[in-house]
Amino acid sequence: MNYATAGVAASTVVENRDVTIERLHRAEPVDAARIVLGSTLVVGDVRIRIVEVEAYGGEKDGPWPDPASHSYRGRTPRNEVMFGPAGHLYVYRSYGMHFCMNVSYGPVGVAGGVLLRAGEVLDGCATVQARRPRVTRPAEWARGPGNLGSATGVTLAENGAALFESDSPVRLEVAESDGWVSGPRVGVSTAADRPWRFWIPESPAVSAYRRSPRAMSADEQMG
């Protein structure tokens, strides 16, 4: 079954920070993902255009319950940033070695995060190459959430960073992409068929879709 859908985003102009924060504050999962897609992540001299994201909802009794989300079972010290305010960086460690980045969205007290899955390096190529010395193709420098974290050098020290403050160690410049495609999220075992992964189809940095071998269909989960 083909779950992919496509559309056109509204603008390629960098938004005013207050406008962006307000949009993220009011956003639901799909809206938040489309806001973040096409934005530029800035960490030191490295600038990376975000070409693939995934939306994750929140608690099981919240407005957009998502069993694949870190916040589904409630607030913890680890997922605190997901509960707001909007526009902050949620960093977590994956498999004990990779650092993955998310953008918080939604009202304060309501959990939500947009996972940054892949990007194209615009500036700071020498820095990124030094961090990823075994990778020879630029399109692969920041392909996949763990590799994107490695390319930026972000660690748990940046967890909670305010992405739209000028003095933040990690900043996000929002300019929506000219086009997008959506489909199921990668590697999740629950809510696997939700088309909450968004990507820019012409980008060579987008990762390949992989369905989790443990994934259940919507009917199986309800049964």
From Swiss-Prot:
Reading the lineage from the top rank, the first entry is Bacteria
What InterPro entries has UniProt attached to this entry? Formyl_transferase-like_C_sf, MPG, MPG_sf
N-terminal signal peptide: none
Group of enzyme by EC: hydrolase
GO BP terms in the entry: base-excision repair
What the entry lists under Pfam families is as follows:
Pur_DNA_glyco
Supply the EC number(s).
3.2.2.-
**Annotated Gene Ontology MF terms?**
alkylbase DNA N-glycosylase activity; DNA binding
Q: Any idea which UniProt keywords this protein has?
A: DNA damage, DNA repair, Hydrolase
> Which family does the entry's similarity section mention?
Belongs to the DNA glycosylase MPG family.
Q: What is this protein called?
A: Putative 3-methyladenine DNA glycosylase
Tell me the organism's taxonomic lineage: Bacteria, Bacillati, Actinomycetota, Actinomycetes, Mycobacteriales
